């Protein structure tokens, strides 16, 4: 696996990095912590992630996703981690998508489009 970015991956990084830095600084995490938010993440921020198509980046196009690969997900995770962004991206957009893709069938048909749409 190459450790460099192609043009599409560089564009992804160039759009996600400033977005996360501006919309989800560490102070955002502290605010969620201090208010003891039950979800542990900002629904508004997740809605913005959805507008960018991030929840569905690993979801196959046949299920309404972007059909990207794990390298692209890694780029997003790197930026989320850099800013300590409280987000369900790893558990939902990576973990759940991998499990559902493996399960296939009606479960994948039901849940993958839902994940892709946020």
Task: Label each residue range with its predicted role.
Residues 21-118:
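Glycine-rich flavin
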Residues 1-25:
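Flavin-dependent oxidoreductase catalytic core characteristic
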């Amino acid at each position: 696996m190459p450790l460099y970015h192609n043009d599409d991956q560089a564009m992804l990084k160039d759009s996600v990095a400033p977005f996360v830095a501006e919309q989800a600084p560490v102070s955002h995490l502290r605010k969620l912590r201090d208010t003891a938010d039950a979800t542990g993440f900002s629904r508004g921020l997740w809605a913005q992630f959805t507008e960018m198509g991030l929840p569905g980046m690993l979801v196959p196009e046949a299920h309404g996703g972007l059909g990207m690969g794990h390298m692209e997900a890694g780029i997003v995770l790197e930026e989320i981690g850099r800013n300590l962004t409280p987000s369900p991206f790893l558990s939902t957009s990576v973990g759940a998508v991998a499990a559902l893709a493996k399960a296939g069938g009606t479960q994948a048909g039901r849940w993958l489009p839902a994940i892709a749409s946020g």
